[in-house]
Amino acid sequence: MKHSLKFRTAQILDIQKFINLINSAYRQQQENSWTSEIEIVTGARINAEQLAQMLADDHFKLFVVEHAEEIVGCIGLTFNPIQVEIGTFCIAPKMQNHGVGKKVLDFVEHYVRDQMLPIHPNLTHFVMWVLSVRHELIAYYERRGYQSTGHIDDYPLSANVGIPIVGLHLVEMKKSIADRI
């Protein structure tokens, strides 16, 4: 990559760019994309109202990932009393398979350890939810030190994040904040 990645906190003005990025990465077939859910979920992955609500939540922080002055990714953190949920994680398809996702995940893990843990010392784990049929993503997160907890939840139809085409569940994965894998 000729230009380095830049990280900043998301702003309301970024919402439409995020909608385009997230829905294209998750709901359209793209060359080189391994995040596309086009064969398992139909409908929009996110909308403006959902993003605005997330950005207004004091317990949520969304990071913008920029490369050459273009938004190429995002990742969200939801802070609970003892854990940090990672979600809204998206890399533009053209930037996938170049180590960008690894750098973004590294960034938020370091951010939590270095910036948030001193303020919130009770934080113990990172947690994320992965679609049960996304075996390649589950394997990727396992290589990054996340482990399935055995907790499986129903696909959140009421969250308005798309309609499953196949039977789906969410698999909870956790990693100790102390682990630096």
Predicted segments with their positions:
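C-terminal "cap" of GNAT-fold acetyltransferases
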Residues: 124-181
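Conserved GNAT-fold acetyl-CoA-binding loop/helix
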Residues: 6, 23-51
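Conserved beta-strand in the GNAT
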Residues: 64, 70-78, 85-90
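Conserved N-terminal entry element of GNAT/NAT acetyltransferase domains
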Residues: 1-16, 176-181
